[in-house]
């Protein structure tokens, strides 16, 4: 049986949390009307991306009342969205939550914080320190927030832990021109999505935002890619759009039988080499 999922390719307002909460209710209602069991929002969809000194003003703890409307909306379909988390030790994190049946069931803190070019994540936020899978409406899932997905270890770790669904919330600006005239960022992201989907035999839900902040345009192009590398659905570039597609757990099983790369992966060799590089002892005991 297939599972209908949705991506809310939206344009959050910078620093306007209450306005963005209202926007979320609209998109969640649209996803519900479309029959989706899960709707994924982009990175920092509750706050906007280029926050800089505003980050501390919009940060919330996981039990903050501002997140209650998201929890309430998740009673009949799962919701994943991004916000600035203020941790118990007062650190600020770029976070993506996953709510189901009225409860926050998982939070991923962005691990890789780009601080180069037009990006300033590392100046205002602390990094996460783990990649953990969790049960979702579409199967066992992992979250890679934007830059996380540009490090191949991220989806590899999720797939090794049993993930069949990779959620990729993003706030990716449109940059560069690829050969043939396509947007350079789009070409890179699409190549990455297809590679991870096909070689890790899982579904990729890439949820990118649109709109403008500080003269930077976010390009959208959200997409759903199947574990055989085929495109399920893709949103237009630069325009808001509710993208809806089907996830088929049986296809994951068929592809993993046909293309058993994960079955044959030698995690012990990977671990031994990493341990050696870090100067750690590694002794595998069968």
Language model regions located:
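Short beta-strand scaffold segments in enzyme catalytic cores
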Residues: 81-83, 94-98, 132, 222-224, ...
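CN hydrolase (nitrilase-like) catalytic-core segments centered on the catalytic cysteine
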Residues: 62-80, 146, 150-242
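Short amphipathic alpha-helices and their capping/turn segments at secondary-structure boundaries
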Residues: 22-36, 153-162
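Active-site catalytic loop in hydrolytic enzyme cores
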Residues: 62-65, 87-192, 257-261
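Cys-nucleophile CN-hydrolase/nitrilase-fold catalytic domain and related Cys-dependent amidase chemistry
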Residues: 17, 26-110, 172-195, 199-202
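A short C-terminal boundary segment appended to hydrolase-like catalytic domains
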Residues: 253-286
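Extreme N-terminal starter segment of soluble prokaryotic enzymes
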Residues: 1-7
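N-terminal phosphate-binding loop and adjacent alpha-helix
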Residues: 9-26
